[in-house]
From Swiss-Prot:
Record lineage: Eukaryota, Viridiplantae, Streptophyta, Embryophyta, Tracheophyta
This protein's GO CC annotations: chloroplast; ribosome; small ribosomal subunit
One Gene Ontology MF term: rRNA binding
Pfam families referenced in this protein's UniProt entry, alphabetically: Ribosom_S12_S23 (PF00164)
Signal peptide interval: none
Known function: With S4 and S5 plays an important role in translational accuracy. Located at the interface of the 30S and 50S subunits.
GO biological process: translation
Recorded superkingdom: Eukaryota
Main location: plastid
PROSITE patterns, sorted: RIBOSOMAL_S12
Protein name: Small ribosomal subunit protein uS12cz
Keywords, ordered alphabetically: Chloroplast, Plastid, Ribonucleoprotein, Ribosomal protein, RNA-binding, rRNA-binding
Gene: rps12-A
Length: 123
């Protein structure tokens, strides 16, 4: 515990909260262009080929974003919408691509949890 004299000399500094998605610049989503679409392998206990894209955002940042769902049509020069949200087993992947908007089509034949994957209600 500091003494009164120490507190007079230096006031307490407020705790600065660091944003988990700095590339979005306080916005809920940002538009970007895919520069590279590829797969990476997850951290230790898991095993898969996770689909990710390198995206150049309108804010000027170049980020790695996860492509959720089974199958995708994203390729180089695709214009995509990016939201925050990390992928726990992929180090350095702190963003998700929003399916069903711009050039990223929704997941084919999806019946449940459609909202997350940009799929309209089946007739």
């Amino acid at each position: 515990m500091p003494t009164i004299k120490q507190l007079i000399r230096n006031t307490r500094q407020p705790i600065r909260n660091v944003t988990k998605s700095p590339a979005l610049g306080g916005c809920p989503q940002r538009r970007g262009t895919c520069t590279r679409v590829y797969t990476i392998t997850p951290k230790k206990p898991n095993s898969a080929l996770r689909k990710v894209a390198r995206v150049r955002l309108t804010s000027g940042f170049e980020i790695t974003a996860y492509i959720p769902g089974i199958g995708h049509n994203s390729q180089e020069h695709s214009v995509v919408l990016v939201r925050g949200g990390r992928v726990k087993d992929l180090p350095g992947v702190r963003y998700h691509i929003v399916r069903g908007t711009l050039d990223a089509v929704g997941v084919k034949d999806r019946q449940q949890g459609r909202s997350q994957y940009g799929v309209k209600k089946p007739k």
